Amino acid sequence: MELSIVTPQGAKGTVAVSEVAFGKEFNQDLVHQAVVAYMAGSRQGTKAQKNRAAVSGGGKKPWRQKGTGRARAGTIRSPIWRSGGVTFAAQPRDFEQKLNKKMYRAALRCILSELARQERLVVVEEFDLDAPKTKILVQKLAEYDLTDALIVSEQVSENLYLAARNLHKVDVRDVQAIDPVSLIRFEKVVMTVSAVKKLEEVLA
């Protein structure tokens, strides 16, 4: 199959790509699983609370077991006491979900294929800036009628990276750093020809 190479003036030529990487049927369940697994793996999981054992103090029994008329108590750090520990306190945990490499790559193929079908994949000859200026990047994106885009390059230049940092609807990634969430998050995905070829090698 072939993808059109786009210029500010319109389509200019095509680039041949593999059906394996850009012509797969969309598998919604697989893509959903990949997205959920990626987002779960991105969680910090550092939330922590103190249970009755972790709260400082409470080593001494506050009063004797019998004879006071009060309810029996073994520690002042019981969860039912003020300043006591938390019942079922949250602990740090790893939310990572296992996803086989084959499934992950297959999900990327599905997403890229669907982007191509929906004409959300914009292939350009090259995408770089002469200076690290956000204004220049905005003007360049406007030439392609883009405001919300992920820019994928084989190797991201420092100028492009610095220029895109201040745009919350624009992100820049090299081929090795793309993921399912970033691909579906943006309205358009701008990809250089060299990035397409590199991605084809990885996913074929």
From Swiss-Prot:
GO terms for biological process: translation. Residues 47-69 are annotated as: Disordered. The lineage of its organism: Bacteria, Pseudomonadati, Pseudomonadota, Gammaproteobacteria, Cellvibrionales. InterPro entries: Ribosomal_uL4 (IPR002136), Ribosomal_uL4-like (IPR013005), Ribosomal_uL4_dom_sf (IPR023574). It comes from Teredinibacter turnerae (strain ATCC 39867 / T7901). This is Large ribosomal subunit protein uL4. HAMAP family: Ribosomal_uL4_B. Keywords: Ribonucleoprotein, Ribosomal protein, RNA-binding, rRNA-binding. Belongs to the universal ribosomal protein uL4 family. Pfam families: Ribosomal_L4. One of the primary rRNA binding proteins, this protein initially binds near the 5'-end of the 23S rRNA. It is important during the early stages of 50S assembly. It makes multiple contacts with different domains of the 23S rRNA in the assembled 50S subunit and ribosome. Forms part of the polypeptide exit tunnel. PANTHER family: 50S RIBOSOMAL PROTEIN L4 (PTHR10746), LARGE RIBOSOMAL SUBUNIT PROTEIN UL4M (PTHR10746:SF6). Part of the 50S ribosomal subunit. Gene3D superfamilies: 3.40.1370.10. GO terms for molecular function: rRNA binding; structural constituent of ribosome. One of its GO terms (cellular component) is ribosome. Transmembrane segments: none annotated.
